[in-house]
């Protein structure tokens, strides 16, 4: 999370007039993350997370917010959205789409244990199953068409080796996207910093703003690529096994899904290598921003062989 849009105390008081959350106390920017402006909001009724959306449009928000409400009602550990007095889940702040969600207990981790990987994998499978009857749709905005378009923009700023690697991987994936596999609503960004933990247990998944329809192996691979990734950008096989084991304890994988998983891992590497390259070479302006190392997923991709 980052802060690109600054919000004054007076703006916040006006915003809160649309909610039954008591009086404004304080607002603290959250520097972690890369896409939206995020704050911890404290009022006389409690603590919340405020998100001001820098890319998503107002009409797109109901999908994400209703999804969180749906999952919360199904027992999935998520940050439930807070409704306004008029019943809406989305709002406007500083001329941009915005929302409030519950502030969950727990914290993220940079060094997960096998137990934490196991329980996170299990909760991801529970999420996949719980969203099966969610009625709204969202296509994946950062899949193969986006990779291809972004690649063309990036080629002039990449080294010859990186450009060749990126182009060859995108070309290899274009006819192998896993569209034949079980699919549904996926988180699509379940990195370690998007999961709050309380000891070994999951207290909540957060930041669903890349959620969309996709194949479950792609979602699982994105998560494993981060949760089992070591400091030198290789995979810890014990953490990978624990994560997938937790997932399969809730939703067993077919032989076809298991066979596709290595390809899904490569697709996950491309998606985040590309997005980090864009953030690095074409950064957004903001007062508190956080750009992640784009080489992490290039190096992980190379380590996969």
From Swiss-Prot:
Pfam families: APH
Pathway as given in its UniProt record: Amino-acid biosynthesis; L-threonine biosynthesis; L-threonine from L-aspartate: step 4/5
E.C. no: 2.7.1.39
Record carries keyword Membrane: no
Gene3D superfamilies, alphabetized: 3.90.1200.10, Phosphorylase Kinase, domain 1
Reactions catalysed: L-homoserine + ATP = O-phospho-L-homoserine + ADP + H(+)
GO biological process: threonine biosynthetic process
Keywords: Amino-acid biosynthesis, ATP-binding, Kinase, Nucleotide-binding, Threonine biosynthesis, Transferase
Enzyme class: transferase
GO MF, any single term: homoserine kinase activity
SUPFAM superfamilies associated with the record: Protein kinase-like (PK-like)
Highest taxon listed in the record's lineage: Bacteria
Cystine connections: none
PANTHER family assigned: AMINOGLYCOSIDE PHOSPHOTRANSFERASE DOMAIN-CONTAINING PROTEIN, AMINOGLYCOSIDE PHOSPHOTRANSFERASE DOMAIN-CONTAINING PROTEIN-RELATED
Similarity comment: family membership: Belongs to the pseudomonas-type ThrB family.
Name of the molecule in the record: Homoserine kinase
Organism: Neisseria meningitidis serogroup B (strain ATCC BAA-335 / MC58)
Name of the gene this protein is made from: thrB
């Amino acid at each position: 999370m980052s802060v690109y849009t600054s919000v004054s105390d007076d703006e916040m008081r006006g915003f809160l007039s649309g909610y039954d959350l008591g009086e404004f106390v304080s607002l603290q920017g959250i520097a972690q993350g890369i896409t939206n402006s995020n704050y911890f909001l404290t009022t006389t009724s409690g603590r919340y997370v405020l998100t001001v959306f820098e890319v998503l449009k107002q009409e797109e928000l109901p999908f994400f917010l209703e999804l969180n409400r749906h999952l919360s009602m199904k027992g999935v550990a998520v940050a439930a959205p807070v409704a306004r007095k008029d019943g809406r889940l989305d709002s406007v702040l500083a001329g941009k789409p915005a929302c409030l969600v519950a502030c969950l207990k727990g914290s993220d981790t940079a060094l997960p244990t096998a137990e934490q990987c196991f329980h996170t994998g299990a909760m991801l499978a529970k999420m996949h199953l719980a969203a099966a009857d969610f009625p709204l749709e969202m296509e994946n905005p950062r899949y193969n068409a986006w990779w291809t378009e972004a690649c063309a923009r990036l080629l002039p700023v990449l080294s010859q080796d990186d450009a060749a690697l990126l182009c060859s991987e995108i070309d290899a994936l274009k006819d192998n996207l896993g569209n034949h596999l079980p699919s549904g609503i996926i988180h699509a960004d379940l990195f370690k910093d998007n999961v709050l933990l309380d000891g070994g247990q999951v207290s909540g998944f957060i930041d669903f703003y890349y959620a969309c329809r996709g194949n479950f192996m792609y979602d699982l691979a994105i998560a494993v690529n981060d949760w089992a990734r070591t400091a030198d950008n290789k995979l810890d096989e014990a953490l990978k096994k624990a994560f997938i084991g937790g997932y399969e304890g809730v939703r067993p994988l077919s032989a076809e899904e298991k066979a596709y998983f290595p390809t899904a891992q490569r697709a996950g590497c491309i998606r985040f290598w590309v997005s980090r390259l864009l953030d690095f070479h074409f950064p957004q302006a903001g007062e508190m921003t956080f750009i992640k190392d784009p080489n992490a997923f290039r190096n992980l991709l190379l380590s996969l062989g």
